[in-house]
């Protein structure tokens, strides 16, 4: 999701690539039911300390702002209205980033969602993450100290 499209619902995904066969496998994200979807910006893949066949995947999710709407609206209209409201909020507030944590078993075709980490005062504009092998912590960078403002689009062009 670009700096000018902080309201788009993320249709991104995580995939594996097997260089010996040239096969790309789009992984199903089990247990990840965010209405804002996944908009991966950066990620780290770390071998598990408890199982040699398991990986922990940390993903920066540059998701749009959360919008609660009247559930009595018909589904098609509700989604259109949600995107319209999210677009307006994104221009004022910027994206609502998170760090998503998944587990992956080698050779599998899915990842299991473990956690969503977010804090509007700390997870401000992350663009890189380095996860811990135990799946319980990570380091991440915030190259910009704010989510919106007149200077942000200019900084975003250089990051």
Model-assigned labels for residue ranges:
Residues 2-15, 98-100, 159:
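A short loop-to-beta-strand structural motif that recurs across blades of beta-propeller domains
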Residues 6-9, 91-93, 154-157:
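A generic structural micro-feature
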Residues 16-23:
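Surface-exposed loop/turn elements that mediate protein-protein interactions on large endomembrane-trafficking
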Residues 26-135, 141-149, 153:
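Asp-box/WD-like beta-propeller blade repeats and closely related beta-sheet repeat scaffolds
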């Amino acid at each position: 999701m670009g700096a000018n499209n902080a309201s788009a619902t993320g249709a991104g995904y995580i995939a594996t690539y097997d260089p010996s066969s040239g096969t790309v496998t789009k992984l199903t994200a089990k247990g990840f039911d965010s209405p804002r979807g996944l908009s991966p910006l950066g990620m780290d893949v770390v071998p598990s300390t408890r199982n040699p066949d398991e990986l922990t995947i940390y993903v920066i999710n540059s998701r749009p702002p959360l919008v609660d709407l009247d559930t009595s609206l018909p589904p098609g209209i509700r989604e259109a209205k949600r995107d319209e409201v999210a677009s307006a909020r994104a221009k004022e507030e910027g994206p609502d980033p998170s760090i998503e944590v998944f587990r992956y078993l080698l050779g599998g075709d899915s990842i299991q969602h473990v956690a969503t980490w977010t804090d509007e005062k700390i997870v401000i504009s992350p663009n890189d993450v380095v996860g811990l092998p135990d799946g319980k912590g990570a380091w991440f960078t915030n190259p910009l100290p704010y989510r919106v403002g007149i200077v942000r689009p200019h900084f975003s062009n250089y990051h």
